Amino acid sequence: MEQEQDTPWTQSTEHINIQKKGSGQQTQRLGRPNLTQLMDHYLRIMSQADMHKQTVSWKQWLSLKNPTQGFLKTRALKRWKSFNKQGWTN
């Protein structure tokens, strides 16, 4: 079986566990994360980014000063349509 070459991606995703034993340190490599761990990490990061976007959106919404009802309706419909196009990613 052919052994996988280290690439910048695989090197950056390797986990390193450092444990202190006595007066010295021992470094133990735990190997590469499996696909499930990578997907969990990706979804966690994307969820945090989505929360940030929602917070920014609400701050923009609250910062509007005396907008007309028609403007608010148009803005809300545009947001809703763009949200539905993106769909649920997590």
From Swiss-Prot:
Location of region: Mitochondrial targeting sequence: 65-87
Gene Ontology CC terms: host cell cytosol; host cell mitochondrial inner membrane; host cell nucleus; membrane
Primary location: host cell
Keywords recorded for this protein, A-Z: Apoptosis, Host cytoplasm, Host membrane, Host mitochondrion, Host mitochondrion inner membrane, Host nucleus, Host-virus interaction, Inhibition of host innate immune response by virus, Inhibition of host MAVS by virus, Inhibition of host RLR pathway by virus, Membrane, Modulation of host cell apoptosis by virus, Viral immunoevasion
One GO BP annotation of this record: symbiont-mediated suppression of host cytoplasmic pattern recognition receptor signaling pathway via inhibition of MAVS activity
Subcellular location field: Host mitochondrion inner membrane; Host nucleus; Host cytoplasm, Host cytosol
Miscellaneous comment in the UniProt entry for this protein: Is not encoded in all strains, and seems to be dispensable for replication.
Quaternary structure (record): Oligomer. Interacts with human SLC25A6/ANT3 and VDAC1. Interacts with host MAVS.
Listed name of the protein: Protein PB1-F2
Organism: Influenza A virus (strain A/Memphis/110/1976 H3N2)
